[in-house]
Amino acid sequence: WIGTAISCGVAAGILIGFVGLWWYGESQHNWFVTVRDTMLRDARLRALGSAQLFAALAVPAAIFSPIGEELFFRGVFATIVTMAAGPVAATLCTAAVFGLMHIFHHGLVMSSAGLELQPFSAMAWVLLTAGLSLMFTWLRVHSGSIWSAVCCHAVFNVTMVAFIVIILGK
């Protein structure tokens, strides 16, 4: 299952990155652009070379979010909803909440006018991250282990960071 998790994470990261470029170019409506801009608010990160920047961003992206989010969403949250409403409802509810939570990475954007909602790209981002949630759940269920979902999530995040550093640049 690890090979499947790695393949799914890489494919999803590349696909979502290029969909953003195709639809929105390098504008603030592109989810990876706003993620990049958020990551690079710190001048110390902007001063790093590409390899150092990749390492500085990829290591925490591969560890903290995947472990914390998967233990919560595919572990605690899905278990509670499954007991209350069954596995299909749990899968759909988990995907919806996971997708909506990620609006804080893209969709609600800080601009010179203050906090702005970008409704169309935000909706696309929420649906894409809900789709990621479905993929993580599928891996969790079919492998019998939450660690396949953690692995896929980590690989997706690292692929996203690589896409940001290599394709979008600083």
Features from the language model and the residues they span:
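Transmembrane helix-loop-helix hairpins at the membrane interface
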Residues: 38, 50-170
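Juxtamembrane helix-loop-helix connectors linking adjacent transmembrane helices
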Residues: 1-65, 83, 113-121
